[in-house]
Amino acid sequence: MRMYDIIQKKRDGKSLSEAEIQWVIEKYVQGEIPDYQVSALCMAIYFQGMTLEETTALTFAVRDSGDRLDFSDIHGLRVDKHSTGGVGDKTSLVVAPIVACMGVKVAKMSGRGLGHTGGTIDKLEAIPGFQTDLPVEKFKKIVNELGIAIVGQNASLAPADKLLYALRDVTATVDSLPLIVSSIMGKKLAADDDCIVLDVKTGSGSFMKTAEKSRELAEWMVEIGKRAGKKMRALITDMDRPLGFAIGNALEVVEAIQTLQGKGPEDLTQLCVALAAHILNLAEKGTYAECEQMAKDAISSGKALQMFADMVEAQGGDKTWILQPEKFPKATYSRSVKAKTSGYIVGVDTESYGVASLLLGAGRNTKEDVIDMTAGIYLCKKTGDFVALGEEIAVLYSSSQKGFDTAEERLLSATKIEKQAPENKPLILDIVE
């Protein structure tokens, strides 16, 4: 085979065969195909698209490009939950312990922050001593004994995805359905879970800005997961507003703990209960209504909070911080952001909120950047709320004052205030099975 012919074929809008797709991924990982040719293929895919068959072949090729985990020695049903990324999305920290309380094994591999969206692993590293990089055998041992562990993605899993993502990131080919699907599902299928529930975000704070695109993404991922023999379900959820009030690593861990205490924000609690209920239902623990009640009971009984604390301890962290969240340090500096006019918050550009937290030090601009764990934003007002002129709408936190002016400017310009109250929009927009 020749890479030139494969690029030309896709450029002309023809379908690639499974053998051609496998060959490209295999040779690229082995270093036998240069970046510039794979860049050209990605751009051809961006413009010409791929069929579901091609995308399935690409996903499986990414999955098979490195090691595949064998969880057969983890006893019982194994589940995973994946979010396509949002702002203030700390659901994994709440959902995983709820599900584990019900005897379903959570062997979860999570990622770091990407662009304006936060990452579960970065959040967990705000807990002193917490180890996100565990040997596979220790990871499996904790899951078998406790029922839950959350670690960072193993570099030997789906190495093709790491190479492709780095390339797509600098060649303006991130926003392509087949490339997004194969990236997410290639990694997910390299792990050995039985059931996967996807939280597909839609709106200004997500990678998919419209409900139609998000639904298409959800349908393709669910179908490809089923083709790989997994039980699948996807929720399409609103990211036209941040989730909860906290944006930033330590701030979000504290809010997740409050949610496990039964004192969390309404939207975050609602979504976490729904995600946990769908996972339990997929794992055949009962009807959806029964599973929803189980999730609520896990919170009200304190069992889910205890499970989270036990997981932190098992992974080397200080569990007293979970049981006494006031131990989390406060940022050195804070600034109050006040409304410049009065009225209702009718909408926000969630991505800009995420970028504002990045400017404060809560995320990375480059791989080498060190995250300020105390940095972030606490929202005092959200979409639908009335604000008076001069009333506090948010508080910015950071270890340095240098990002405050730009972050405040970004936040205010991203907040739309009008005289008329907005219509209420549901948080969960659709379910794909």
Please describe what each predicted stretch is:
Residues N144-C195:
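Phosphate/diphosphate-binding glycine-rich loops and adjacent basic-rich segments that engage nucleotide
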Residues M109, V143, V151-N154, I184, ...:
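Short beta-strand segments
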Residues M1-G88, T259, M307-D318, I428, ...:
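Acidic, glycine/proline-rich low-complexity segments that act as flexible tails and inter-domain linkers
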Residues D5, K10, S15-S17, R68-L69, ...:
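Well-ordered secondary-structure scaffolds
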Residues K123-A149, E219-G225, G229:
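A glycine-rich helix N-cap at a beta->alpha junction
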Residues F47-Q48, L93-A107, K187-D192, R227-A228, ...:
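Alpha-helix C-terminal capping segments
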Residues F60-S83, V136-A166:
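Self-splicing inteins and homing endonuclease
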Residues L77-A100, V104-H116:
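Glycine/serine-rich anion-binding loops at beta->alpha junctions
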